[in-house]
Every structure is written in C-alpha cells, then in structure tokens.
Amino acid sequence: MQSKPQLLTWITCDGVHIDPGSGKHTLLGVFSNIQARQFPVTHPFMVWFLTISDCSPGQHRIRISLGLDPTALQPLLERPFDSASPLHRINLINEIRNLSFPQAGDYSLLIEIDDEPILATSITVSG
C-alpha cells in the first residue's frame, strides 16, 4: 500500500538562501499575514517554502490554489517535482510574484500533490 505524501513544513517568507557549501536552507523574513493600506493590493514577491516526505519514487505534481471563496479557488502554481525515495525530504521553493488581493479577508489556500489535498489553510490580508 502506497502512503500519502506528507507536508512537514509550510512557511511563507521573503526569500530562501541555499548555502553553496552545505546545501542548508536559510529562510529570510518569515511572515504569516499581509497588511495593506488600500485595496486592491499586489504583493510583489514572496516564497512559499515546503518540505514534503513519503512521496513514492518518480515524478509528482504540486498545485497551490488560492481564493476568498474556499469553494472557488484559482490555481496559482502548478509544477512537477521528482522524488527518489519516500524516505527523502524534498524541499520545494515556490516563488510567487505579483500576487493580487482585491480586498481584505482570509484567503483560503489549498496545496495538492498529484490531485490529493495535503493542506488546507488560509492567509490573512488586512487593511
């Protein structure tokens, strides 16, 4: 029986530095909400950093969707990634550019791997 991929880490930040010598990841400017003076607002750049385990060997697909209405989420990002073994921890650095928020609110966010939800959460955008 194949296990479901597990999300070990989900962090929103300003950037990720990867040390060329050690391969260690340093997360810069971690945040959990967005504040704006007026709406609509466009956030110029952020990184969604994920660590995933229990992925069977081979190619997989991650999709991240977002929206104010949790029943009508729009895909923001969809891309492939590879897994060598279910024992490996896979760090995925997802750069999000020019993300628009039409109004303040709690925006629902859904992360799926191979069309299977692994996290449903929200990000608060306030004025």
Where are these regions (language model features)?
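Contiguous segments within soluble domain cores/interaction surfaces
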Residues: 2-127
